[in-house]
Amino acid sequence: MRLFVFFMLCLLVLLQYHLWFGKNGLGDRHNLQEEVTLILENNSELRQRNQMMFSEIKDLKEGTDAIEERARNELGLVKEGETFFRIVPKED
C-alpha cells in the first residue's frame, strides 16, 4: 500500500511540474496572454492611424481645402492677391 501511495505522490508531483513549468504550461499561458494584449493594443493604434489616413484621403479626393492647406504648408504657395510674410528670428 505504501508503494502505491508513493507512486501516486510521484505521479502527482510529475503532473504538477508539467502543469506549472512544462511546455504549454501556466507560465507559457501567461506569456501568451501578455503577447496577445500587446498585439491587440498595437492593432488598435494601427486602426486609428488607418482611420485618420482614410479621412485624409477622402478629404483630398472630395474637397479643395485639404489640397490648399498642403500647398501652403509643404510647398509655400500663396493665393493670388495674398502677401506672404516670413519672420526670421534674430541671431545673437
From Swiss-Prot:
Task: Note the topology in the membrane.
Answer: Single-pass type II membrane protein
- Complexes and interactors: Part of a complex composed of FtsB, FtsL and FtsQ.
**Looking at the keywords, is Cell wall biogenesis/degradation present?**
no
Any single biological process term in GO: FtsZ-dependent cytokinesis
Q: Per UniProt, which keywords does this protein have? A: Cell cycle, Cell division, Cell inner membrane, Cell membrane, Coiled coil, Membrane, Transmembrane, Transmembrane helix
State the protein's purpose: Essential cell division protein. May link together the upstream cell division proteins, which are predominantly cytoplasmic, with the downstream cell division proteins, which are predominantly periplasmic.
**Which residues lie in coiled coils?**
28-62
**Among its keywords, does the record have Iron-sulfur?**
no
**Topology, Cytoplasmic side:** 1-3
Q: Which GO cellular component terms, listed alphabetically, does the Swiss-Prot or TrEMBL entry include?
A: cell division site; cell septum; plasma membrane
Q: Which residues lie on this side of the membrane: Periplasmic?
A: 22-92
Q: Which family does it belong to?
A: Belongs to the FtsB family.
Q: Which residues cross the membrane?
A: 4-21
Question: What gene name is listed for this protein?
Answer: ftsB
Per its record, how is this protein called by name? Cell division protein FtsB
InterPro entries given in the database record: Cell_div_FtsB, FtsL/DivIC
Per the record, the domain of life is Bacteria
Localization, UniProt: Cell inner membrane
Q: Which HAMAP family match?
A: FtsB
Q: Which Pfam families match?
A: DivIC
